Design a protein with these regions (language model features):
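N-terminal topogenic membrane-targeting module
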Residues: 25-125
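Alpha-helical adaptor scaffolds
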Residues: 96, 116-195
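Long, non-transmembrane cytosolic or organellar matrix-exposed soluble domains/tails
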Residues: 183-273
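Hydrophobic/aromatic side-chain positions at a characteristic register within alpha-helices
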Residues: 63, 92-95, 133, 164-165, ...
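Helical anchoring/docking segments at protein termini
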Residues: 1-58, 258-273
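Short coil/turn linking the two alpha-helices of tandem helical-hairpin repeats
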Residues: 59, 66-70, 136, 165-170, ...
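Alpha-helical repeat scaffolds
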Residues: 101-110, 138-147, 169-184, 206-216, ...
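Residue-level recognition of tetratricopeptide repeat
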Residues: 60, 130, 161-162, 198-199, ...
Length: 273
């Protein structure tokens, strides 16, 4: 890492200079060397993170503008449902893929900083993995996953989803769940609990799914968790549904959303439009 090399060079230079000026008193020389190391590390990391923040801000702005445009198209179709819903869905997926490709290209501007900041390469791999996941490039996702930092609910859920699709043992997926959940605070693990319960049901383990949701309702305040817990308690396994989690759930591509079309209100002047 360049930042460590620069800090070490500064520390050695200051240490040797202090030793000569202090008549071979190594204690003071080492102290000034340590302070030089910390000062150099702070300065370099501050400048690098400032550049990283600027690139990330540009990427977030790009995604925000794209999401607004995509939501406007969806709302327009729901308010005035003309055309084939499947064609509209295909157009939305095409637009989203184009947007993610642009964001991915923008993110690659961060690659040079991997040599400057400790662990940043793993953070960047996590961001790249999430973009490739949304583009459904799962081969690349599986390639990047071992080099990612699983620190947020979505990246943890993505890892669990890939393990499920790749037919990993349930015990292995459960380990990923507990590891990802351990870092989260109250009301942050809804997606992880919902996904793990769904995986239990897919493996014919309704009792484990119900027990998990009971714990999940203690760690979170969420209507979907409560509803699914009650359904499993009443043996209504077929009514288990995570659709109310919205985009977070469907972003895992384990289930497909349904386009809901709003009924148009008739005009009072008798004109059809």
């Amino acid at each position: 890492m360049y930042s460590i090399l620069i800090a070490c060079s500064a520390a050695v230079a200051v240490c040797l200079s202090s030793w000569r000026l202090a008549d071979a008193v190594w204690g003071w020389a080492l102290l000034w060397g340590a302070l030089a190391f910390l000062g150099a590390m702070f300065s370099v990391n501050y400048l690098v993170r400032k550049r990283i923040t600027a690139v990330m801000a540009g990427m977030q702005a790009l995604l925000a503008d794209g999401q607004k445009e995509m939501q406007a198209r969806v709302n327009a179709f729901q308010n005035r449902p003309t055309g084939d819903p499947k064609r509209i869905m295909a157009e939305m997926e095409k637009f989203q893929k184009k947007l993610l490709t642009q964001a991915l290209e923008h993110t690659m501007k961060l690659e040079p900083f991997c040599k400057w900041t400790l662990l940043f390469s793993r953070q960047l791999n996590t961001t790249l993995m999430q973009f490739h996941y949304q583009m459904q490039d799962f081969k690349k996702v599986d390639e990047l996953m071992p080099r990612c930092l699983i620190l947020d609910p979505m990246s943890g859920a993505m890892k669990m989803a890939r393990q499920h699709v790749n037919k990993a043992p349930v015990e292995e997926i459960e380990k990923t769940f507990f590891k990802a959940k351990a870092r989260l605070k109250y009301n942050q693990s809804v997606l992880l609990y919902s996904l793990m319960a769904w995986i239990f049901l897919k493996n014919d383990m309704p009792d484990k799914a119900h027990a998990l949701l009971v714990k999940g309702c203690k760690d979170n305040e969420n209507e979907t968790l409560n509803r699914n817990r009650d359904r499993l308690a009443n043996n209504k396994v077929r009514e288990f549904n995570n659709a109310n989690l919205g985009d977070e759930w469907f972003a895992l591509f384990l289930e497909q959303p349904k386009i809901q079309m709003r009924r148009q209100q008739p005009r009072l002047d008798g004109r059809p439009f």
